[in-house]
Design a protein with these regions (language model features):
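Transmembrane alpha-helical segments in integral membrane proteins
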Residues: 76-87, 149-164, 248-258, 328-344, ...
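Hydrophobic alpha-helical transmembrane segments
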Residues: 68-72, 139-152, 317-328, 384-403
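Long, contiguous internal "core" modules enriched in hydrophobic/ aromatic residues
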Residues: 12-41, 89-91, 129-133, 140-323, ...
Length: 453
């Protein structure tokens, strides 16, 4: 890549080259959150799960809620990015890497929630060594491991050309970039092999991503607990994962755009298109939620209705109706018309959906366990400071991972932006030739073509 091109995209190098006080303040705050989580986990590890609000019959609470939530957020990256790549949506270029990084980071955090939830984390390997292959828990471990491996590879492959650019033009961390660039020089053969590998991975990760949250839903639906034993849970969980993933991506885009002044790359059109996708997923989420609860209501089974009314009018009604407001009412109000103030509307709606989808996971898990089918007394769950600390630490660790990635690598793909410019110029030239007389049209890379962009 020429020095002129590097200078043109200098804004993409700025987060890597300069470190302001805001970075250190952010890391300090996140460090405090992580420290709180570490103290909470050590307290739990030392004294046992009795220091949490988990008890019979409510044996799952914040930890499993966070697990399902983080695994769902992971669909922001690999699945959405892969679909946009395969559909050749040109507007995807500035946002794909942001989405892919979210996937890899939250998968690590999500898988860690299972470790936190275990009373004996030292026995985790027993799931692999002695687990029953008929168990959805073993399927879960297998599918998440496969998804994490595929997503990491899918993030790394498009990163290689940009790492080579950093190796050649950024003095700091040159040894690291030289190792990770794998000898990339940008030859035609290398580009051909890379594009083929990315295309293959894009095809592979879609069924893997869908299978992951389907298997997560099996952990619930393959029991006979009220409001869990349902065949709709597979598509319901996948749709919810995509819904929360799009919302998380929009929030990340807005923050990065604001902090690093990337308005030239993350434009209103990107927020508008993702806002339309979010609106579609809002309607799909409402359809699946309505179908699930309507079916349970008409079945009128006593155990099911006990959980049903606990959510609608019972002790969980504030959380249930807050979920409906965050996932349906507010997004519908904001996203129906995006011609004006598209960025502000989509960001507010997305932040609402992120909160609403966490509440949805909680509403799926805790009300059912509080009203079990077996003749246990009605359960009550209230998280202790340990669970709040673990949750804060998990979110802090995810954000810290993301911040460090932005500090080490371009969060917007430099080579894909350049490729998009050249492809756009070629497309314009081809269109001009169809209805204008033949003439000297500037080729991509020519000074006239550069002036046109």
């Amino acid at each position: 890549m020429s020095d002129a091109t590097v200078e043109r995209d200098a804004a993409l190098f700025a987060p890597l080259a300069r470190t302001g006080p805001g970075f250190y303040w952010t890391v300090a705050v996140l460090g405090l959150m992580i420290l709180w989580g570490a103290v909470a986990y050590w307290t739990q590890f030392d004294q046992g799960l009795g220091v949490t609000g988990l008890q019979q019959p409510v044996s799952w609470g914040f930890y499993v809620t966070n697990f399902v939530f983080f695994i769902g957020i992971s669909h922001a990256g690999t699945l959405i990015s892969a679909i946009l790549r395969l559909s050749k949506a040109e507007w995807r270029r500035p946002i794909t890497r942001m989405a892919e990084v979210i996937t890899v980071m939250v998968l690590f955090i999500g898988a860690g929630q299972i470790l936190v939830d275990l009373g004996r984390p030292d026995r985790l390997m027993n799931v692999i060594l002695y687990g029953r292959y008929q168990s959805p828990l073993l399927w879960d471990a297998t599918s998440i491991s496969a998804y994490l491996t595929a997503s990491t590879l899918y993030l790394y492959l498009p990163l290689i050309p940009d790492i080579a650019i950093l190796r050649d033009h950024l003095g700091k961390r040159r040894f690291l970039y030289s190792v990770l660039a794998l000898g990339w020089t940008g030859t035609e053969h290398q580009q051909k092999v890379l594009n083929r590998a990315i295309a293959i991975m894009a095809v592979l990760v879609i069924p893997i991503a869908v299978s992951v949250h389907t298997v997560v839903s099996f952990v619930f639906s393959m029991t006979i607990q009220p409001m869990w034993h349902s065949s709709i849970f597979g598509p319901y969980f996948v749709a919810g994962a995509i819904f929360s993933g799009i919302a998380a991506l929009i929030v990340a885009m807005a923050i990065i755009r604001r902090i690093y002044h990337l308005e030239a790359y993350l434009k209103p059109v990107h927020f508008r298109y993702l806002g339309y996708l979010l609106l579609v997923m809002t309607l799909l989420w409402f359809y699946l939620t309505f179908a699930e609860y309507l079916t349970g209501y008409y079945g009128n089974e006593p155990e099911e209705m006990k959980v049903f009314w606990a959510k609608f009018t019972g002790p969980f009604w504030p959380l249930f109706w807050a979920m409906v407001f965050c996932n349906l009412v507010l997004p519908m109000i904001l996203l129906v018309r995006l011609q004006h103030h598209a960025i502000g509307k989509t960001v507010i709606a997305s932040a609402s959906v992120v909160v609403g989808m966490w509440l949805e996971r909680f509403n799926i898990i805790v009300p059912t366990l509080s009203n079990p089918r077996l003749p246990f007394p009605e359960g009550h769950y209230w998280p202790t400071w340990v669970e709040w600390g673990e949750t804060a630490g998990s979110f802090g660790l995810f954000i810290l991972f993301y911040v460090l990635f932005v500090k080490l690598f371009p969060i917007i793909s430099i080579w894909e932006i350049r490729e998009g410019r050249e492809a756009g110029l070629r497309e314009v030239e081809e269109r001009l030739r169809t209805y204008l007389p033949d003439g000297p049209y500037p080729a991509p890379g020519h000074e006239g073509a550069k002036a046109a962009t």
